[in-house]
Amino acid sequence: MNMTSISSIALSGMNAAQTSLNSSAHNVANMNTSGFRRQEVIQNAQIGGGVSTTLTTSSEQGPSVATDVVAQLQAKNSFLANLAVFKTSDQMAGALLNLKV
């Protein structure tokens, strides 16, 4: 695995976390809308690394504030963890470039 693929995997994780955060924010913003059905995010591991996301609509009507608050916290923590990996990969690549010069 090279530095580029590590960065790409971390970036896909950050994008997945952002999608989850957007979805839960959408759910909270629309919870008082009549007939509203929650959005749910399905994450799938990709061959070669990384993650993809799919938005679906819940079969159940109505809000689930507790679920959305937990989803927001998970998205935040996932984003921060992937950001740390991305930064570390960037620092390692920079150190390798300095050695080659």
Task: Map each language-model feature to its residues.
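Amphipathic alpha-helical polymerization modules
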Residues: M1-V101
